[in-house]
């Protein structure tokens, strides 16, 4: 039973509506970006501020809790997918699927094709692992070693690695941010991923053209493979037994993506197959296989000496690896649930949409929101959740499918994040690859061209999914039900 307060709730003013969001921006911009404070308590403080506003508007404490609970309950299936992602990475690692991708990817290196190979192989590894940071910190570091050995352009190599890492991340069902964008927009994961290709695939092609042309005109002629690459490939070959069965877990996920099968069951089947590979082909014991699924793979499970460079490559995955992402999600969803009860987002969006007169300007408004959030908060998850929460109903009212929104937010926040020096992603990529963010920025073509293609498609209508009248009516009706429940 819903408990209400005696005071009749009222609609907030524009200033009251902006106050919680501005508070969150200031707290995250100052605390997280400037002083490196963890974002979770800052989001909790932002939620408290939003809660005080909601109380001032006439809502009760129980109504606030009810709104937060409903917001979390609605996203619980996607949160379960995030946990399944950690399970999949851990089992793919111990089963040999990811190591085999890395092994054969590194075997493809050719001097003149160094830059485009770095782009494409990092993309492949990132698709398979679902982590841009992981692929940049492993394969990316390996390619930087190749570039140093060949006396290549380190900024161009780093740009190729970053672009490839983020393409793979956005087009992988294992990616936390991709799952988060789909759940926030209430769009099927695979539908979101396929729709994202309208902007990421042209950006990848453009990146590949730039890297190929530059590679053939850069004077790279050495055919020597640096010792770093030899250590990785020989180390992996000594630890794992590679055969085509290692690809079966990948094929299962790809099949599920193409046929749009339920995400979690497909991931579980893929993980089970990877476990069988780990036991029957790789020779790991059952205890280590289960531990890898829960806590992630660790090189201590390999009972032989391996090169130190493989430690960073192999130590990853597990369901527990997703707990940090889940905590941020819960904090952000608490803020979103509290704010949704106040009606503040409706007030803000109403003012914002006075400037929107076409699909193109709607896309531009979304890009502006995404860039502002990532530029100020420096947090990818928050920069996904808040703009989608603000604009989803506006898209539906204009007959635009919410997957246009989830795609544009990823283009303007997630993919743009690593080319901003003050964000965690920008700092990580610069520190890991040894190249300043602003130096590799021009070469990370995919990261900044996404918003160009998003804007172009918005004004031309290409790749813009429209809702049928029936779909629009159903989604609007569901939105009214959700509002009534709040």
Language model segments and positions:
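Core mid-bundle transmembrane helix pairs that form the ion/substrate translocation pathway
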Residues: 222-260, 268
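Short juxtamembrane and helix-loop transition motifs at transmembrane-helix boundaries
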Residues: 2-10, 76, 93-104, 120-124, ...
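Membrane-embedded alpha-helical segments and adjacent helix-loop junctions characteristic
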Residues: 58-148, 305-393
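Generic alpha-helical transmembrane segments of integral inner-membrane proteins
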Residues: 22-30, 48, 52, 79, ...
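Juxtamembrane and boundary regions of transmembrane helices in multi-pass small-molecule transporters
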Residues: 33-35, 170-173, 181-234, 397, ...
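Alpha-helical transmembrane segments of multi-pass membrane proteins, especially transporters
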Residues: 42-50, 70, 74, 78, ...
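Hydrophobic transmembrane alpha-helices that form the pore/transport pathway of multi-pass ion
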Residues: 110-202, 369-411, 475
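Hydrophobic transmembrane alpha-helices of multi-pass solute/ion transporters
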Residues: 2-87, 93-113, 251-331, 486
């Amino acid at each position: 039973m819903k408990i209400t307060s005696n005071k009749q709730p009222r609609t907030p003013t524009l200033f009251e509506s902006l106050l919680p969001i501005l508070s969150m921006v200031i707290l995250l911009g100052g605390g997280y970006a400037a002083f490196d404070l963890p974002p979770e308590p800052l989001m909790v403080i932002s939620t408290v501020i939003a809660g005080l506003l909601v109380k001032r508007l006439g809502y009760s404490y129980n109504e606030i809790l009810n709104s937060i609970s409903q917001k979390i309950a609605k996203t619980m299936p996607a949160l379960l997918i995030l946990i399944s992602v950690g399970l999949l990475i851990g089992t793919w690692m111990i089963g040999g699927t990811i190591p085999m991708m890395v092994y054969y990817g590194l075997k493809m290196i050719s001097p003149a094709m160094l830059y485009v190979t770095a782009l494409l192989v990092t993309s492949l590894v990132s698709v398979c692992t679902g982590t841009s940071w992981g692929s940049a910190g492993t394969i990316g570091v390996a390619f930087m070693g190749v570039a140093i050995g060949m006396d290549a352009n380190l900024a161009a190599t780093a740009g190729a690695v970053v672009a490839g890492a983020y393409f793979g991340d956005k087009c992988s069902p294992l990616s936390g941010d991709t799952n988060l964008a789909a759940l926030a927009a209430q769009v099927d994961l695979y539908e979101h991923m396929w729709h994202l290709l309208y902007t990421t695939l042209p950006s990848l092609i453009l990146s590949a053209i730039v890297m190929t042309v530059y590679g053939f005109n850069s004077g790279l002629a050495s055919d020597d493979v640096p010792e770093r690459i030899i250590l990785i490939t020989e180390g992996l070959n000594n630890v794992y037994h590679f055969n085509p069965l290692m690809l079966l877990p990948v094929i299962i996920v790809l099949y599920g993506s193409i046929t749009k099968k339920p995400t979690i069951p497909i991931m579980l089947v893929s993980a089970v197959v990877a476990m069988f590979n780990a036991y029957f082909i790789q020779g790991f014991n059952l205890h280590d296989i289960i531990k890898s699924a829960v806590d992630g793979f660790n090189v201590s499970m390999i009972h032989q000496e391996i090169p130190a460079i493989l430690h960073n490559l192999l130590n990853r995955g597990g369901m527990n690896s997703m707990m940090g992402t889940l905590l941020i999600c819960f904090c952000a969803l608490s803020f979103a649930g509290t704010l949704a009860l106040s009606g503040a987002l409706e007030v803000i969006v109403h003012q914002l949409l006075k400037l929107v007169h076409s699909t193109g300007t709607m896309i531009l408004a979304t890009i502006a929101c995404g860039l502002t959030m990532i530029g100020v908060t420096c947090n990818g998850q928050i920069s996904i959740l808040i703009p989608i929460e603000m604009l989803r109903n506006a898209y539906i009212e204009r007959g635009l499918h919410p997957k246009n929104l989830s795609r544009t937010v990823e283009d303007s926040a997630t993919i743009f994040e690593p080319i901003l020096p003050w964000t965690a992603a920008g700092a990580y990529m610069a520190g890991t690859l040894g190249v300043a963010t602003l130096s590799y920025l021009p070469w990370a073509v995919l990261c900044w061209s996404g918003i160009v293609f998003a804007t172009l498609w918005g004004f031309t209508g290409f790749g813009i999914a429209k809702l049928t009248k029936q779909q629009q009516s159903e989604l609007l009706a569901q939105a009214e039900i959700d509002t009534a429940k709040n």
